[in-house]
A protein has these predicted regions:
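A conserved active-site cap/scaffold subdomain adjacent to cofactor or substrate pockets
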Residues: 32-139
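An acidic, phosphate/nucleotide-engaging active-site surface
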Residues: 1-7
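A glycine- and small-aliphatic-rich helix-loop capping segment at beta-alpha/alpha-beta transitions
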Residues: 19-30
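Hydrophobic alpha-helical scaffolding
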Residues: 29-33, 87-91, 164-172
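Short glycine/serine/threonine-rich phosphate/pyrophosphate-binding segments
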Residues: 7-18
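General structural feature for long, well-ordered alpha-helical segments within catalytic domains
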Residues: 2, 13, 35, 39, ...
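Short, glycine-/Ser/Thr-/acidic-enriched flexible segments
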Residues: 11-12, 50, 87-88, 154-156, ...
Length: 187
Protein backbone atom coordinates (compact mmCIF):
# COMPACT_ATOMS: atom_id res chain seq x y z
CA UNK A 1 0.00 0.00 0.00
CA UNK A 2 2.79 2.53 -0.60
CA UNK A 3 1.71 5.90 -1.96
CA UNK A 4 5.15 6.63 -3.39
CA UNK A 5 7.88 4.22 -4.45
CA UNK A 6 11.35 5.63 -5.05
CA UNK A 7 13.88 3.47 -6.85
CA UNK A 8 17.14 3.73 -8.64
CA UNK A 9 16.99 3.62 -12.39
CA UNK A 10 14.85 0.65 -13.39
CA UNK A 11 13.74 -1.00 -16.62
CA UNK A 12 11.70 -4.11 -17.61
CA UNK A 13 14.70 -6.18 -18.66
CA UNK A 14 16.46 -5.60 -15.31
CA UNK A 15 14.66 -8.56 -13.72
CA UNK A 16 16.49 -10.93 -16.07
CA UNK A 17 19.74 -8.96 -15.94
CA UNK A 18 19.70 -9.10 -12.14
CA UNK A 19 19.34 -12.89 -12.19
CA UNK A 20 22.26 -13.16 -14.63
CA UNK A 21 24.45 -10.85 -12.52
CA UNK A 22 23.71 -12.96 -9.47
CA UNK A 23 24.16 -16.34 -11.16
CA UNK A 24 27.29 -15.56 -13.18
CA UNK A 25 28.93 -12.95 -10.94
CA UNK A 26 29.04 -10.30 -13.67
CA UNK A 27 30.61 -7.04 -12.53
CA UNK A 28 29.20 -3.53 -12.91
CA UNK A 29 31.63 -2.69 -15.75
CA UNK A 30 31.43 -5.94 -17.72
CA UNK A 31 29.62 -4.08 -20.48
CA UNK A 32 29.27 -6.94 -22.98
CA UNK A 33 27.87 -9.29 -20.32
CA UNK A 34 25.47 -6.60 -19.07
CA UNK A 35 24.33 -5.85 -22.63
CA UNK A 36 23.77 -9.56 -23.29
CA UNK A 37 21.77 -10.03 -20.09
CA UNK A 38 19.76 -6.93 -20.96
CA UNK A 39 19.07 -8.30 -24.43
CA UNK A 40 17.88 -11.56 -22.89
CA UNK A 41 15.58 -9.61 -20.57
CA UNK A 42 14.32 -7.55 -23.50
CA UNK A 43 13.46 -10.74 -25.40
CA UNK A 44 11.49 -12.03 -22.39
CA UNK A 45 9.89 -8.80 -21.13
CA UNK A 46 6.78 -8.78 -23.33
CA UNK A 47 6.01 -12.44 -22.71
CA UNK A 48 4.28 -14.10 -25.64
CA UNK A 49 5.31 -11.47 -28.18
CA UNK A 50 8.47 -13.58 -28.47
CA UNK A 51 6.46 -16.77 -28.95
CA UNK A 52 4.36 -15.42 -31.81
CA UNK A 53 1.63 -13.49 -29.99
CA UNK A 54 2.19 -10.31 -31.98
CA UNK A 55 4.21 -11.71 -34.86
CA UNK A 56 3.95 -10.41 -38.43
CA UNK A 57 3.20 -13.96 -39.60
CA UNK A 58 0.86 -14.50 -36.65
CA UNK A 59 -1.03 -17.37 -38.31
CA UNK A 60 2.08 -19.55 -37.80
CA UNK A 61 1.74 -19.23 -34.01
CA UNK A 62 -1.34 -21.48 -33.89
CA UNK A 63 -3.83 -21.28 -31.03
CA UNK A 64 -2.70 -18.14 -29.21
CA UNK A 65 -5.23 -18.77 -26.42
CA UNK A 66 -2.80 -21.47 -25.24
CA UNK A 67 0.42 -19.73 -26.21
CA UNK A 68 3.54 -20.60 -24.27
CA UNK A 69 5.55 -17.88 -22.56
CA UNK A 70 9.24 -17.61 -23.49
CA UNK A 71 12.01 -19.27 -21.52
CA UNK A 72 15.68 -18.31 -21.74
CA UNK A 73 18.55 -20.71 -21.09
CA UNK A 74 21.46 -18.34 -20.46
CA UNK A 75 25.17 -19.20 -20.65
CA UNK A 76 27.87 -17.40 -18.61
CA UNK A 77 29.20 -15.67 -21.77
CA UNK A 78 25.79 -14.05 -22.38
CA UNK A 79 24.58 -16.17 -25.26
CA UNK A 80 21.16 -17.69 -24.66
CA UNK A 81 18.59 -20.00 -26.14
CA UNK A 82 14.98 -18.87 -26.26
CA UNK A 83 12.32 -21.57 -26.15
CA UNK A 84 8.86 -22.21 -24.68
CA UNK A 85 7.25 -24.91 -22.55
CA UNK A 86 6.55 -28.19 -24.36
CA UNK A 87 2.92 -28.78 -25.25
CA UNK A 88 2.07 -25.09 -25.56
CA UNK A 89 1.10 -23.33 -28.74
CA UNK A 90 3.00 -20.45 -30.23
CA UNK A 91 6.21 -20.29 -32.19
CA UNK A 92 9.82 -19.49 -31.32
CA UNK A 93 11.62 -18.63 -34.54
CA UNK A 94 14.25 -16.31 -35.91
CA UNK A 95 11.36 -14.08 -36.98
CA UNK A 96 9.60 -13.91 -33.59
CA UNK A 97 12.82 -13.32 -31.66
CA UNK A 98 14.11 -10.76 -34.20
CA UNK A 99 10.88 -8.77 -34.08
CA UNK A 100 10.99 -8.67 -30.29
CA UNK A 101 14.68 -7.68 -30.30
CA UNK A 102 13.83 -4.61 -32.39
CA UNK A 103 10.67 -3.74 -30.43
CA UNK A 104 10.84 -0.27 -28.84
CA UNK A 105 14.64 0.02 -28.86
CA UNK A 106 15.14 3.04 -31.10
CA UNK A 107 18.77 2.77 -32.19
CA UNK A 108 19.95 -0.89 -32.20
CA UNK A 109 23.56 0.33 -31.91
CA UNK A 110 22.79 2.52 -28.90
CA UNK A 111 19.90 1.17 -26.82
CA UNK A 112 20.06 3.16 -23.59
CA UNK A 113 19.39 1.34 -20.34
CA UNK A 114 20.16 2.25 -16.72
CA UNK A 115 23.03 -0.25 -16.40
CA UNK A 116 24.54 -0.29 -19.89
CA UNK A 117 24.31 1.12 -23.40
CA UNK A 118 23.63 -1.85 -25.68
CA UNK A 119 24.75 -2.49 -29.25
CA UNK A 120 22.65 -5.25 -30.83
CA UNK A 121 23.92 -4.66 -34.39
CA UNK A 122 26.23 -7.72 -34.46
CA UNK A 123 23.89 -10.12 -32.66
CA UNK A 124 23.27 -13.37 -34.53
CA UNK A 125 19.92 -15.15 -34.15
CA UNK A 126 19.93 -18.80 -35.22
CA UNK A 127 17.22 -21.45 -35.31
CA UNK A 128 18.86 -24.51 -33.69
CA UNK A 129 15.76 -26.73 -33.40
CA UNK A 130 11.98 -26.33 -33.58
CA UNK A 131 10.98 -23.65 -31.04
CA UNK A 132 14.64 -23.17 -30.01
CA UNK A 133 16.52 -20.06 -31.10
CA UNK A 134 20.07 -19.20 -30.05
CA UNK A 135 21.00 -15.53 -29.62
CA UNK A 136 24.68 -14.56 -29.63
CA UNK A 137 26.10 -12.13 -27.06
CA UNK A 138 25.58 -8.39 -27.52
CA UNK A 139 28.16 -5.63 -27.13
CA UNK A 140 27.93 -2.97 -24.45
CA UNK A 141 29.48 0.22 -23.19
CA UNK A 142 28.96 2.49 -20.19
CA UNK A 143 25.43 3.56 -19.31
CA UNK A 144 24.35 7.11 -20.08
CA UNK A 145 24.71 9.71 -17.34
CA UNK A 146 21.18 10.99 -17.97
CA UNK A 147 18.05 9.01 -18.57
CA UNK A 148 14.34 9.54 -19.06
CA UNK A 149 11.95 9.56 -16.13
CA UNK A 150 8.38 8.53 -15.60
CA UNK A 151 6.00 9.76 -12.95
CA UNK A 152 2.40 8.77 -12.33
CA UNK A 153 -0.10 9.88 -9.75
CA UNK A 154 -3.78 9.39 -9.00
CA UNK A 155 -5.91 12.43 -9.76
CA UNK A 156 -9.41 11.07 -10.26
CA UNK A 157 -8.99 9.91 -13.84
CA UNK A 158 -9.40 6.44 -15.26
CA UNK A 159 -7.58 5.21 -18.30
CA UNK A 160 -8.48 2.81 -21.04
CA UNK A 161 -6.33 1.03 -23.54
CA UNK A 162 -6.64 0.24 -27.20
CA UNK A 163 -4.82 -2.43 -29.14
CA UNK A 164 -3.89 -1.76 -32.72
CA UNK A 165 -3.22 -4.31 -35.42
CA UNK A 166 -1.39 -3.54 -38.64
CA UNK A 167 -0.71 -5.36 -41.86
CA UNK A 168 -2.46 -6.94 -44.80
CA UNK A 169 -4.52 -9.28 -42.59
CA UNK A 170 -4.95 -6.99 -39.60
CA UNK A 171 -8.69 -7.59 -39.27
CA UNK A 172 -8.18 -11.35 -39.08
CA UNK A 173 -5.33 -10.87 -36.62
CA UNK A 174 -7.51 -8.66 -34.39
CA UNK A 175 -10.36 -11.19 -34.50
CA UNK A 176 -7.95 -14.00 -33.58
CA UNK A 177 -6.60 -11.99 -30.65
CA UNK A 178 -10.14 -11.18 -29.46
CA UNK A 179 -11.16 -14.85 -29.64
CA UNK A 180 -8.05 -15.88 -27.68
CA UNK A 181 -8.63 -13.21 -25.02
CA UNK A 182 -12.21 -14.39 -24.50
CA UNK A 183 -11.11 -18.07 -24.33
CA UNK A 184 -8.49 -17.26 -21.71
CA UNK A 185 -10.96 -15.18 -19.68
CA UNK A 186 -13.48 -18.01 -19.71
CA UNK A 187 -10.91 -20.70 -18.82
Amino acid sequence: GADIIITGRVVDSAVTLGACIYEFGWGATEWDALASGSLCGHILECGPQTTGGNFTDWELAGDIANIGYPIAEVAPDGRFVTTKPPGTSGLVSVGTVSEQMLYEIGDPQSYLLPDVTCDFSDVTITQIAPDRVQVSPAKGRAAPTHYKTCLTYADGFRAGSYLTFYGARSTSKAESFCDAAVKRAEA
